[in-house]
Amino acid sequence: MNLREKIDNSPMGFYQWAIVLMAAVMNFLDGFDVLAIAFTATNISKDFGLSKTEFGMLVSAGLIGMVVGSMVLAPLADKFGRRPILLLSVAFSAVGLAVSGFSTTSEILAFSRILTGLGVGGILVGTNVITSEYSSKKWRSFAISVYAAGFGIGAMIGGMMAKSLQAAYSWHAVYFAGAAMTAVVFVVLFIWLPESIDYLNAKQPQNAKARLNKIAHKLGFAGEWELTEKRAEKAVKLPITALFSQKYLRSTLLLWLSFFAIMFCFYFISSWTPALLKEAGMTVEESINVGMMISLGGAAGSLVYGLIASRWSARSVLMLFTVASSIAIVVFILSSANLAIAMVLGVVVGALINGCISGLYTINPATYDADIRNTGVGWAIGAGRAGSVLAPTVAGMLLDSGWDKQTLYIAVAGVMLIATVALAFKKSHIEIKRA
């Protein structure tokens, strides 16, 4: 039995759960960042005189950075290792948030959002993969859901901090706080985050065996562990091209479509709900509270998905969540005139959509072999970020052109069902391995 098989089939120990927690904290930073921009929207737009379309483009600037980060940094992680690229990504994010705090023009803020997004994109890929690789088969879905729950918790705290810091200081303080938290996380990761076991086995860099055994002892697995037999390098110049081989083509394209649709819906809900509810008659505080309820539901929904998917097929549970999310989005917007109902339904919408994201993060790494896993995961997340880039901008343009919020939310619910269809036709990981 090699170390990979030992991890797959053994109970998860303290260090493995610590790795999952570190990944969750990194995802927490993504959640903080997304809700920080959503909840500072009113003051930023007022300071810089931005229209809805212009603010949507500002939000999209950060998301463009995420697309580039997930697609460009992911292949580098397959080549140089998950750990160094994760550390680089966290550093980018910290610097970007600090520059956001110092921004005096919308152009500087847009640049800082791209830089932050670049880091977040790299973080998302690395954390998803490393969580999957250090989890046992039994607890993998739940571990990924714990990691995914970090986003909802970060979003909720981001909303709370945005609310209090803007009241006491200004919107700039929100980004300074984010930069400080990210810098602390960088130090923690530098000390405790290990390299990927699968990377060490697949690429076998210098001192790979010694590093493998050092990690094994931290995991509580005594003895001398050998590297697995190194597979012959495939005649592929770029791991990206392998995603379109006969083995992976269908699953790659359907995964991309699923990510695009679900992330489009998620970022529309996250970015626009507080502002639209305020325009509909809620106070700023009430609209932010509903936004935080969506985030609170998100944290719970990720965990609920993980528990259910530990018992049944991860893909089937994900399809069920997409259908339920579509229905919940429509019911939410039709009931938004009542604050109490809106807050309750906000929790439900947040839970279901974040459960969908947990599902994507669960089935995505299992689709690809270790030598191209980071690339496969990164490009799928990048496709999702393309949806998230379009969501705020398209929504802003449609609102400026006269669409009402009910029509817009119903259209978004329809986009969610596209993911349901794509997932229905995607090959299972067992079918892919047999190919």
Summary of predicted features, one role per range:
Residues 1-32:
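Cytosolic juxtamembrane N-terminal segment immediately preceding the first transmembrane helix
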Residues 1-7, 192-247, 251, 433:
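Intracellular cytosolic loops and amphipathic helices of Major Facilitator Superfamily
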Residues 37-38, 244-302:
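Extracytoplasmic gate region of multi-pass secondary transporters
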Residues 49, 81, 102-108, 119, ...:
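Helix-breaking motifs and short loop linkers at transmembrane-helix boundaries and internal kinks
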Residues 68-106:
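Conserved MFS/SLC helix-loop-helix module at the cytosolic interface between two early adjacent transmembrane helices
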Residues 96, 107-115, 340-348:
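Paired small-residue
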Residues 147, 152-198, 202:
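Helix-loop-helix hairpin linking two adjacent transmembrane segments in secondary transporters
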Residues 309-360:
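C-terminal transmembrane helical hairpin of 12-TM major facilitator-type secondary transporters
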